[in-house]
């Protein structure tokens, strides 16, 4: 384990919906990579307890998806609060990345950050203010090189750790096929 300013913190949240004013976090996971996207460590994968009433108010899509992947059962069985999950995550990150060094990394991370600001503000503050959002490259590829979109396929399990692994792999794909760091810009 080595604390390094260049390490990247990857995060994904699963929520009961998309509106942080009315919805809550039900799962959080993190992975730390080096600057070259090699996985150094996987953080705790934490199901956050939420009330049956809140879970029952989820959209049909959320109920179907989070029931099929087992997350609803894990949330109901969990005793973990959002605050406890936040502190466990920060304790893990402190071993790998200094506070304020890493941008928040993942897919559509602005959405995750909205929930972090609302429910896990200390964790939100752990990140640099910049974002490393893989979905930006996806949107650019869609417009400038749409043929690249067929080269990477996601499983979309909507489990936080799986989603992070896919985000890292997707960024590596775009690095190799879109950004082309080797200087071969055809």
Swiss-Prot record:
Known function: 3'-to-5' exoribonuclease specific for small oligoribonucleotides.
The record's section on SMART domains has: EXOIII
Is Cell cycle tagged as a keyword?
no
Ranked from the top, the taxonomy reads: Bacteria, Pseudomonadati, Pseudomonadota, Gammaproteobacteria, Pasteurellales
Molecular function GO terms recorded: 3'-5'-RNA exonuclease activity; nucleic acid binding
- List, for all copies, the residue spans of the domain called Exonuclease: 8-171
Q: Please give the name of this protein.
A: Oligoribonuclease
Give the InterPro entries listed for this entry: Exonuclease_RNaseT/DNA_pol3, Oligoribonuclease, RNaseH-like_sf, RNaseH_sf
